[in-house]
Amino acid sequence: MLENWSTVYDLEKIINDIFILHKNNNNKKFSTNILISGKSGIGKTQILDQICKKNNLKLKVVQAYQYGEFITGLPLVNNDITKFTKAEWVQEVLDENPDVIMFDDAHLIRSEYLNHFYETLTFRIFQSTQLNKNSIFVLIGNWGIDAAFFNDIPLPIMSRMNYIFKFEPNLNKWIEWGLNNNIDKRIINYLSYFKDEFIINSDVNEIVISPRNWEYFSEALKNGLQLDYFDTCLGVKIGNKFKDFLLVLDKSLDELLTLAKDKNLKESEKIAIIVALGNYDNAYKNKSITDYISSLNDDRIVLWITIISQKYKMEDNYKEILEFKKYIQKQFPSIYEVYNK
């Protein structure tokens, strides 16, 4: 499986196809320039990195601020003659001869350097230095409503793009990626129900939450982040909600089933009970658990089924997955068809 976060369309497949078309374009009459735009922290850079690795393509990442700040290189004075070294990134590109050159955070290229950038995109020339004409150029950035108040992409640059993509992360794909990349299981379990919290804008929460936040939060949890500091990663509202969720997960089976009778539970605590019962060993074979789950509405039952499925996938326990599917088909036939898909 390709390890990345996917878009609402299959972006990795499309870019793979573009790379193949470029490779088969023997005369290279036209350069291949790709623009991938979207909000910060949603995995634009990672998806390109993983696609290049999958296709054994050498990738060179150029940070956009380097393009402007080092456009002339460093001055070398010899008597009365001053020459300039090649910009550092240009020399690296010449030395490494990459298949793909990615300009990360391309919206940071200062407007006074856009003419030079246009020349680079069109002719693969930078300050009279010829770059590899066969290299694919990929611009990664945030434009339009995602611009974060930096430069909008001007029309001449846009006209040089052969392919333009608006990147939107997909939670289901991210969860699939997370199961294979050691994202904390409790985060995956939480987002399996609270799907609207995968991405949150600042007008809803004190801080913007993106897939990158959840990835950083996962690392912080593994490194022993204390409960009192959850709000530094997720904001006060979501941080406290996740804290309530987490505290329930550590309870014993008897404590969980007793707590489930409490009429004053918060929503996050109710969901945590279902998650904890899903992660219990042989959960679907335990009558006290299945009796409680059977009393719930369908969306809560689906969550419980999802948690058990995720657990078996992480364990590579395919034998148990098959047995569990048989159980669902027998006990919840109306849900089985959706689950099986």
What are these regions (language model features)?
Residues 1-101, 105-341:
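C-terminal regulatory/interaction module of P-loop NTP-utilizing enzymes
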